[in-house]
Amino acid sequence: MAKKVANILKLQIPAGGANPSPPVGPALGQVGVNIMDFCNAFNAETQSAEKGMPLPVVITVYEDKSFTFVVKTPPAAVLIRKILGIAKGSGEPNREKVGKLTRAQLEDIAKQKEPDLNSNDIDAAVLIIAGTARSMGVEVDL
């Protein structure tokens, strides 16, 4: 018989940086999960990722207080900022541009994000990433 799901948590945690302090500790403590078990498991699974890169994680908590988690790929906005070497996107994306992305750079990001994107092929994934870039005030070269 399958375990009964009690709760689903979605958090963004830096790779290799899960610790019991906020926001991780309080979120897990509220649902009764052993915080250190999660932190150790998450840090072990993300040690190959770039240190400090924020990773979305979906934690499924069961009624017996056990848990499973799925680590997703970094957000597209974080990958775009990393490639361009900027701290944040534009405050006025329609007027003030903060950088420019080529098709090749968009394809690199799309290939990295492909498992988490809702697209059938790489061209559709590139368009999704291009939309994110435009909303950040980044010029897109398609």
From Swiss-Prot:
Part of the ribosomal stalk of the 50S ribosomal subunit. Interacts with L10 and the large rRNA to form the base of the stalk. L10 forms an elongated spine to which L12 dimers bind in a sequential fashion forming a multimeric L10(L12)X complex. CDD domains: Ribosomal_L11. This is Large ribosomal subunit protein uL11. Forms part of the ribosomal stalk which helps the ribosome interact with GTP-bound translation factors. GO terms for molecular function: large ribosomal subunit rRNA binding; structural constituent of ribosome. One or more lysine residues are methylated. It comes from the Bacteria. One of its GO terms (cellular component) is cytosolic large ribosomal subunit. Belongs to the universal ribosomal protein uL11 family. GO terms for biological process: translation. HAMAP family: Ribosomal_uL11 (MF_00736). Keywords: Methylation, Ribonucleoprotein, Ribosomal protein, RNA-binding, rRNA-binding. The gene is rplK.
